Structure formats: structure tokens, C-alpha cells
Amino acid sequence: MSTFINPAQMPAIGLSEEQAQLIDIAASFCRDKSPVDAVRALLEEDTGFNPDIWQEIAELGWLGIGIPDTYGGIGLGLGEIVPIVEQMGRHLLTTPFVSTVLAAQAVLRGGTEAQKNEILPKLATGTAATLGFCEDHGDWNLAHVTCKGSVAGDKLTLSGTKYLVSDVLQAAFMIATVAVNDQANLVIIPTDALPPEAIRREKIIDETRRAYAVVLDGISDGGRRRRKCAGETLKQ
């Protein structure tokens, strides 16, 4: 027997005062900064975004919304980020915003205290970052991560390929899921450690976005273990 839900019986979903204000501000900003002609012009650019607009976004404090004030952020929640992302999508304003916000959350949940103090203030003020978690099998199960990290002494050497990595050319670092000793870990990979031939642009449906395959073979942390986040947060 089918069960029907009366919409009138469903609880109303409202916006907080902060969310309502952010919608208005974000709508105005995105509308002004991303007219159709600007969107079309950026389709021909390698990066696909305007760095001056990115700097303005950082100055507005949007990158620090989901970061606690302890680490240089504003200390609100992801619910306050949603209105901004919604307006960016509506007006096709392409930036590394989502990639950087998600990378910040990965550090916040999986990093050591030293890593949080080092990285999060930078992300809150305009340093871009990204995530590398997709692999060719398309499986989201962390137990099936095929990218590996081999430990020799205090040195971690990576292998494997990540796909659909957003905004890697603009990112200062990528946080990737890697299996180390059969345990899923988050590994921080500075993008300046990636040779140009390790990054290949992929074709995707949305031409306003940039996504890449990133080959990790031979990438090493040079003994600087700070690049390795606390892996137990990803253990299944």
C-alpha cells in the first residue's frame, strides 16, 4: 500500500537571520561579478576563473565561514555556506570556493592540531585547496581506495591516480585519500610537488568547471610527516 505525505503536515524550512543576509549579499555579488559575457570569456581560459574575484571573496570572509574562529575563521556552519554556493551556481560564478571549503573541513576533521593551526588560517584568507578522492572504479568506499602510500623510514611515497580533481591548478595543495598499510588516510600533497605531466585536464559536461586527473606515482613527502593527516578518522 502506498503512503502519501500531505505537504501541509511537513515542517516549514526557514532561514536563519545570517543565512537570509548571506543570500542577499551573495546574490548581489554573484550577479554583478558574473554577467553572461564574463562567463563566456572564462570558458576560453585555462583556469576558468577570475583571480581578482577570488581575492574579493576572501576579503568578504566567505572562506572562513565554516572555520572556527580559533583558526582564523568566522565560526559559523556549513548551513551558512549553502546560500553562497547556491548563488554561485545560479550565476555561473566559477571559483575554487567549494573545493577550498571542503578541503578545510577535511583538515578540521582529520588533521592534527599543528596542521589545523598551520593550514586553516591560510584557507580562511584566500589560499585555495582541493580534494582528490575519485578513482577510476568510481567506488566511494574507503576500504577500496587503490592509491597507495609506501612508508620507508620517515618517508612516504605515493602511487596511483586521482580523477575529477577540481581546481588543482589554482590549489596550493590537494588532500587525497590514500591507503597506507591497508588503512585509508588523508594525505596533504603540495601541488608544487606535482610535475606538469602528472596533471591532465578531463572533459566534463559543465564547461564552466575545470577537473583533472592527477598521477601520484613517485610523489614523496621528503620525510616531512606533517603532510600526512591523522588517518584514523577515515578508518572503517
Whereabouts are the PLM-identified features?
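Buried hydrophobic positions in well-ordered alpha/beta secondary-structure cores of metabolic enzymes
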Residues: 19, 30, 61, 68, ...
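A structural signal for short hydrophobic beta-strand segments in well-ordered beta-sheet cores
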Residues: 147-150
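Glycine-rich beta->alpha junctions and the first turn(s) of the following alpha-helix
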Residues: 10-24, 89, 197-236
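A short core secondary-structure module
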Residues: 155, 161-198
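A short, Trp-centered hydrophobic/proline-enriched beta-strand micro-motif
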Residues: 125-135
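Internal helix-loop-helix
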Residues: 8, 59-125, 167-171
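Generic N-terminal amphipathic, Lys/Arg-enriched alpha-helix
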Residues: 2-13, 33-39
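Short secondary-structure junction/hinge motifs that connect adjacent elements
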Residues: 37-59
